[in-house]
Amino acid sequence: MTRTNFTASILVSISLLSLFSCTSNEIGNIKDVNPDAVFFDYTVFADEDNSDVTVNLQYRMGGKNGTSLVLDEPSKVLFDGEQLKVDSAKVTGAFYEMQKPLAAFTGKHVISFTDLNKKEYNEEFEFTPFTLEPNIPAVLERGDLVFTFSGLESVDVLSVTLTDTSFQSADIMNDTDTVRNGRLVIAAHRLSALVNGPINFQLYKEVDRPIKNGTKEGGNLHIRYGLKRQFELQDAKKL
């Protein structure tokens, strides 16, 4: 495995782990909790190079880091009308999860939760992946790098990571950049830490907002989508 691929794999693993870290792995039952004290913890994440989107839904007692809950009838959760089954893991506790094809996921979706009193809470969101237009050339010369996107807001924010294949260099890692009118500019001076050769380029957009239709305890919706590219960086040709 090259350093580029190794570093990329580590960064993705760390990013995904951070989505679920610092939470309790204890498991309880929703029947033992006041319905108004249930916290909704919703996560949707996908990558361009993965064929599926993952929808992960958790219900907790004691806020975002509290005890995870198993839904007892008549409580249930549906995603776009399809009921989810409970699963569990040592790290995260109880959760409700499904995968959907990325190719057909663009657009509006609804998460429908029913509590023990049969009260329904519908949480709607829209999933819009972004793309590079046009794609990145195989070779880029040093200088200000300009990238153009579709699928972003007029002013949007992306997490940007650039890594090279040299173990001696200091990478540009996890910078946050503003994209204006679909245009991202990475200034030439920021490339000084990278050596010439293969460059791994990762871009992620994250949306993190409070639940709009939840209990008194509230909740959080986190949506994450990313893409990766590789190109060769070389010195600008002298005129």
Annotate each PLM feature.
Residues M1-I10:
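Bacterial N-terminal signal peptides that target proteins for export
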Residues T23-K118, N122, H189-L239:
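Ser/Thr/Pro- and often Gln-rich low-complexity regulatory segments
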Residues F105-G151:
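Surface-exposed beta-loop interaction hotspot
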Residues E126, I136-V139, L162, M173-D175, ...:
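Surface-exposed beta-strand edges and their flanking turn/coil or helix-capping segments
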Residues L132-R190:
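Short helix-loop boundary/capping segments
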